[in-house]
Design a protein with these regions (language model features):
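Basic, alpha-helical interaction scaffolds
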Residues: 1-38, 473-546, 598-601
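Short amphipathic alpha-helical coiled-coil/interface segments
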Residues: 30-33, 56-64, 72-87, 91, ...
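Active-site palm subdomain of RNA-directed nucleic acid polymerases
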Residues: 270-283, 386-417, 421
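Short, conserved micro-motifs composed of acidic
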Residues: 169, 448-480, 581-588
Length: 670
């Protein structure tokens, strides 16, 4: 392939040598890559029932010819027996493959086999038809495509000015090393865009091809002009719920050319760090070393700090309506100019956003291409950074409003991308913050979904507390619990309800995988490893923010024994003790100790980070502790498990190697 590519490139290179047009360079590059790969083996699609045989299909045809029950039933029974036999044989072969890949450390192939057996690749069923604006059902394919084109056009329609020109022409040429790094970071096995070029093809280019790709990228970077094909995206619709018929009940994923993705990875490397420095510490989304864990942890710790000194925490959980699709492109470019992004980078982003088009694909048929006039691009590596800086300028206008004061620092919001929690210490301050955030968000085109935006009071006596926050003429609903970043927050800031919820989610997943996890074909050791990967990981989501008691620790161990008894096919009615179960399976309880170690390691991470999380853990709030026995706090767990006073925990956690030893050793039980 490499030789074929080089030969064709050398033949056509002379024709385009003097050309400075990105379009011609792109057509040459695309033709060369596709020609070199035209005889490459194609990936075969898998059938729905891979165990189905020609013999069974033939028997089914014979069954159709049966004219009465006496003729039909024997044939039907024979087919059922054949299906069971073939399915069992296929199942056993897959189990053997799992064992083989496990022994060879082929984890990717092992997980692929597990998904085949458990049916995790199944998509939600759809009717194939959708409703128009008036709610009338559309059945014809042309009508469905036309409706999708209309929906996309209306969703992304905006009145924007002509293409802006950057205030400077700064920006160094793109280096070959940058392109090589971007290609190396690109994942394999991803669907191509309209050009048909896959990541596997681009990874085969090697030095000669990468030189040509770098030339193309520098032409685009210097002029800001993109080849037309690179600006075309294809949207694939996925239903949010089974049998969805309304366009708004679908989510779309975007297929774009991988060549463009690599180019944008280069741009990301240039502007990503600059944007991240400008984003405030209360934004946890799309940032290195940060995620939902940090957002959940920070909110829970702040809530506990308020309860320690008998103060209430007033919260408004904001839900924006399609926030990523409502970004105004003109304001986005202005944000980039304000933080000093190079002119060439701004020009590239502006041209990309002003000239992009998209079409919807329904069963291999495309709707007409539509201009996308607002919103950040779906599936683009730049979008998270651009959205973060866009919303940062909204909240900069609100930072001076009073929220909570912890360790001398005013905090009135916690964010993960568009998931926002506004926090204050009283109703009046919360009303001011909500009003200001709504006002600034509206200026930027983002609208609150009033029906889904909720308020809550974290308090020692929540039943006596009421809060009325207005958005326009509507009063926001006050709730007793709220799912924030996938974890359930309650008005008493306890972990018991969240742990019960995680247990139920994990049990539901276990029941879906029960056929595999209770199979006698797999070794117990393999099943335990699968349980740890698929079941325990679901259960432990957000466990770093849990505050545990002796009762909750007992519930965690009971859930672990439930899983172990199931995979060992041991019933409760067998009256076998937990210790005997562990001996029979030749294993030990590990779930609780793993959670404890994760919490301790996370405390060390927080202590050494010296950021808002450190402030939340170590900071003090004004106020006095109430009378009576104090509640267990997050730090209570750390002190009791390590048998160290708070001051020793603080000093020793600052030493990574020392704290690592403490987190690994057997921990003190309550």
């Amino acid at each position: 392939m490499k030789n074929k590519y080089e030969l064709l490139s050398l033949e056509t290179d002379e024709q385009c040598q003097e050309s400075s047009e990105p379009e011609k360079k792109w057509q040459q590059l695309k033709e060369s890559i596709n020609y070199a790969n035209e005889n490459a083996p194609k990936i075969e699609r898998k059938t729905k029932k891979v165990w189905m045989t020609e013999e069974i299909l033939t028997k089914m045809e014979e069954r159709k010819k049966a004219k009465n029950t006496s003729a039909y039933e024997p044939k039907n029974k024979e087919i059922q027996n054949l299906c069971k036999k073939e399915k069992d044989a296929w199942y056993n072969n897959k189990c053997d493959e799992i064992e083989k890949y496990l022994n060879l450390n082929g984890t990717k192939k092992m997980h692929s086999c597990i998904k085949e057996l458990t049916g995790d690749n199944k998509s939600k069923p759809t009717t194939g038809c959708i409703k128009d604006k008036e709610g009338k059902m559309l059945f014809e394919r042309d009508q469905v495509l036309e409706r999708w084109a209309e929906y996309v056009s209306e969703l992304f329609a905006d009145e924007r000015p002509s293409l802006p020109e950057p205030s400077n022409d700064r920006g160094p040429p793109i280096l070959k090393s940058e392109v090589e790094k971007a290609i190396k970071m690109t994942q394999l096995g991803k669907a191509p865009g309209e050009d048909g070029i896959t990541t596997e093809m681009l990874k085969l280019l090697e030095d000669f091809g990468i030189d040509k790709l770098t030339e193309l990228f520098n032409l685009i970077y210097a002029s800001g002009q993109f080849p037309e094909e690179l600006l075309m995206s294809i949207y694939i619709t996925l239903p949010k719920q089974p049998r969805a018929t309304d366009c708004s009940n679908f989510r779309t994923i975007s297929l774009m050319p991988h060549t463009l993705k690599i180019f944008l990875k280069v741009i990301q490397g240039r502007i990503g760090t600059k944007i991240d420095k400008e984003v405030g510490p209360t934004q946890f989304g799309f940032r290195p070393g940060s995620g939902t864990r940090e957002g959940i942890f920070c909110y829970n710790i702040i809530a506990q700090k308020h309860l320690e000194v008998d103060k209430d925490l007033y919260t408004c959980f904001i839900d924006y309506s399609k926030a990523f699709d409502k970004v105004h492109h003109e304001q986005l470019i202005q944000c980039l100019e304000k933080i000093g992004v190079d002119g060439r980078d701004i020009r590239v982003i502006a041209n990309l956003y002003w000239h992009q088009k998209a079409a919807i694909r329904i069963q291999n048929q495309l709707s007409p291409f539509t201009s996308i006039q607002r919103g950040v691009r779906q599936g683009c590596v730049l979008s998270p950074y651009l959205f973060n800086i866009y919303t940062e300028f909204i909240f900069r206008e609100c930072n001076e409003l009073q929220g909570i004061n912890i360790h001398g620092q005013n905090i009135n919001n916690l964010r993960y991308a568009d998931d926002t929690a506004l926090i204050t210490d009283n109703q009046e301050n919360l009303q001011r913050v909500v009003t200001k955030v709504r006002e600034e968000s509206s200026k930027a085109g983002l609208e609150m979904n009033v029906k889904k935006t909720k308020t809550m009071i974290i308090s020692r006596k929540p039943e006596d507390k009421k809060v009325e926050i207005k958005v326009g003429d509507e009063i926001l609903q006050q709730v007793h619990k709220y799912i924030y970043l996938g974890t359930e927050i309650t008005e008493e800031a306890r972990s018991d309800i969240e742990i019960e919820k995680r247990k139920n989610i994990a049990k539901e997943k276990f029941s879906k995988m029960a056929g595999l996890l209770t199979s006698r074909k797999l070794k117990i050791k393999t099943k335990i490893r699968i349980v740890k990967c698929y079941i325990y990981s679901l259960f432990c989501y957000g466990c770093e923010s849990w505050t545990l008691s002796k009762v909750l620790e007992g519930k965690i161990e009971a859930f672990e024994m439930f899983c172990l008894r199931k995979i060992g096919n041991i019933k409760w009615s067998d009256k076998i003790t937990n210790e005997r179960v562990l001996q029979k399976l030749q294993t030990k309880r590990t779930l609780l100790s793993d959670i404890q170690k994760r919490k301790l390691r996370y405390y060390g991470h927080v202590k050494r980070s010296n950021n808002i999380l450190t402030t939340a853990v170590e900071g003090k709030l004004e106020g006095k502790r109430p009378r009576g026995r104090p509640r267990n706090t997050w730090m209570t767990d750390v002190r009791e498990w390590t048998s160290l006073p708070a001051s020793a925990c603080t000093s020793q956690a600052a030493d990574r190697s020392l704290w690592s030893v403490i987190a690994r050793r057997p921990l003190q039980r309550r």
